[in-house]
Swiss-Prot record:
GO MF term set: molybdopterin synthase activity
PANTHER family per UniProt: MOLYBDOPTERIN SYNTHASE RELATED
Entry keyword Transferase: yes
Protein name stated in the entry: Molybdopterin synthase catalytic subunit
Assembly behavior: Heterotetramer of 2 MoaD subunits and 2 MoaE subunits. Also stable as homodimer. The enzyme changes between these two forms during catalysis.
Catalysed reactions, as listed in the record: 2 [molybdopterin-synthase sulfur-carrier protein]-C-terminal-Gly-aminoethanethioate + cyclic pyranopterin phosphate + H2O = molybdopterin + 2 [molybdopterin-synthase sulfur-carrier protein]-C-terminal Gly-Gly + 2 H(+)
Entry-linked InterPro entries: MoaE_sf, Mopterin_biosynth_MoaE
Keywords of the record: Molybdenum cofactor biosynthesis, Transferase
Involved pathway(s): Cofactor biosynthesis; molybdopterin biosynthesis
EC identifiers of the protein: 2.8.1.12
Its job: Converts molybdopterin precursor Z to molybdopterin. This requires the incorporation of two sulfur atoms into precursor Z to generate a dithiolene group. The sulfur is provided by MoaD.
Domain of life: Bacteria
Length: 148
């Protein structure tokens, strides 16, 4: 387990939560994002995630650094799963601890928004009658590689 990582296997939540705990932390907020069955009235069969792993892990660590600058004393761990994910599977987990709960909540919300903005992860939604790629705001895989 790494503090910031992309994985293929199902996410085991407890190890990431435990990573953020020490004697100075008074709160831990854990967010898990799951695959939902229905989106805007369309039934999802499953999702497929892809990532440019070296850069994605660097960007996840960058988010951890940003959080520590904005909310000193926090400890963050972020993991995102790639590959095919079934309904209710965990796609992303963010664990943030801090001396006080407000910082942990704010930092956790900040993390999920930054993941969507800067981490090169792409999501393909597969429905009964088709599919569509969604994802990273900065473009495709080749563009992400050039940024490295």
């Amino acid at each position: 387990m790494k503090q910031f990582e992309i994985v293929i296997e199902p996410i085991q939540t407890e190890q990431y939560r435990e990573f953020t705990i020490n004697e100075y932390q008074g709160a831990v907020v854990v967010f898990t994002g799951h695959v939902r069955e229905w989106t805007k009235g369309v039934k999802t069969e499953y999702l497929e995630y892809e990532a440019y792993i070296p850069m994605a892990e660097k960007k996840l660590a960058q988010i951890g650094d940003e959080i520590n600058e904005k909310w000193p004393g926090t400890i963050t761990s972020i993991v995102h799963r790639i590959g095919p994910l079934q309904i209710s599977d965990i796609a992303v987990l963010i664990a943030v601890s801090s001396p006080h709960r407000k910082d942990a909540y704010r930092a956790n919300e900040y993390a999920i928004e930054r993941i969507k903005e800067i981490v090169p992860i792409w999501k393909k939604e597969i429905w009964e009658d088709g599919s569509k790629w969604q994802g990273h705001q900065k473009g495709n895989y080749e563009e992400a590689k050039r940024e490295e």
